[in-house]
Amino acid sequence: MRKIFMDIETDALLDDMTCVHCIAIAINEDKPKAYGPDDLEEGVSEMLHADMLIGHNIIGFDYPALMKFGRTRLIKNFDATFRDTLICSRLLYPDLKEDDWRRMHSPARKEFPKDCYGRHSLKAWGYRLGHHKGKFLEETQDYGTYTEDMADYCKR
């Protein structure tokens, strides 16, 4: 089975978005590869060969974002099963606020930011699991320009 783990970076949220900057794809257990503005179509082509497409909020954001920018080959030729880890998180951990309350009142509390409390975001899960995605989104003010730092962030 060909599983593709994916993420995208854009210049804004869905309604205000004007471009997809990059797609990061990891096939099965391989290291992720980022496809920047000049080779987005190559990344989309890789996705067409997936049996399962896995990502955080791919149903609510990533897939609609790709469709918004004319990646109609995806809709016409896509047979893969979607595994949206945001939906999985909400289904598997409906009482996350209780778990986080205990986390916030434990010796590990200094490691868990208050803005992650009760959230199912990648940032929050990164802190819970000790795999921080990075601070690119927090530290940058310009999402309108593609950078290698953005590509590195997308691959995490």
Listing of model-derived features with the role each one plays in the protein:
Residues 26-28:
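A generic structural motif
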Residues 1-22:
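Entry/capping segment at the start of metal-dependent catalytic domains
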Residues 14, 30-37, 52-156:
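Active-site-proximal helix-loop-helix substrate-binding element of RNase H-like nuclease domains
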Residues 22-24, 34:
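Ordered hydrophobic segments in well-structured contexts
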Residues 1, 49-51:
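A general structural motif
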Residues 40-47:
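Short amphipathic alpha-helix with an adjacent loop that forms part of the alpha/beta core around
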